[in-house]
Swiss-Prot record:
It comes from Methanocaldococcus jannaschii (strain ATCC 43067 / DSM 2661 / JAL-1 / JCM 10045 / NBRC 100440) (Methanococcus jannaschii). This is Uncharacterized protein MJ0489. It comes from the Archaea.
Amino acid sequence: MGCGIMKYGITEMVKTIDTKTRVVDVTNEIAKKKYQAIRDFLEGEEFKEVVIFGVYLWGNYTAQMLSKYADKVYLVDIHEFMKGFVPNNNSIKFLNLNEFKLKFIRGEVNPDLIVDLTGLGGIEPEFLAKFNPKVFIVEDPKGVFDVDIYEADNTYKRTAPFIEKAKVGVLKTYRKARVSKTSGTMTLTIDTIVDASREITSLDGVLYAIPNLRYYEGILFHENDIHKFLSEISQPAITISTLNDVLDEAEEILSNNINLIYSFVEEL
């Protein structure tokens, strides 16, 4: 969390307030909820070798947390520059997808836990089917029903090869009584901040509330600029123009919206 900053607006009667809660704080809270759902599903099991497919947006957090319960964690991503998110940790090794496939062909990887966070258009079911883990978990990217998203999704094709030979779980994330098109961490971050902004605007004395959001994926995947990405998501989540000091109410509204997010793993 940052510290709420108050400045004057056009006149001294109008104040401009930035929330203490930053964009990254919302993202981190969502990551914690998703990881806790995975941890509950694993029921305290420990693993020799874990493979996590997908660094963005919370694979790195998952790797760090699971490294406490595993001898080795491979964090695999199709984008080489994603290595910049991975801390120096002897138990976590980043591999781009081609490097990982080469290690697999050589028989150098044999995970007993696989976590697939790649979502829509992610890792191919045919490649996943070559493994024999004790546990397989895949993140279901779907949120509220959308015909095109449902047609593009292949979550259950990815789980099919493991149903008879492993413990299989599908990670699902929704917002209670709210609409989000996908369960993606960025989708949920944006929807949470936008909805909170609308609620803050309804407070007495508030002129407007602006979500401080950017096209973050453009910064990351088009510019490949991790430092700029991290700088942008470290900005206050919402800026408020107001006659009154509504910072505490704004923080409570943000917190309530974050608390609407619910993650669980459905066992197949």
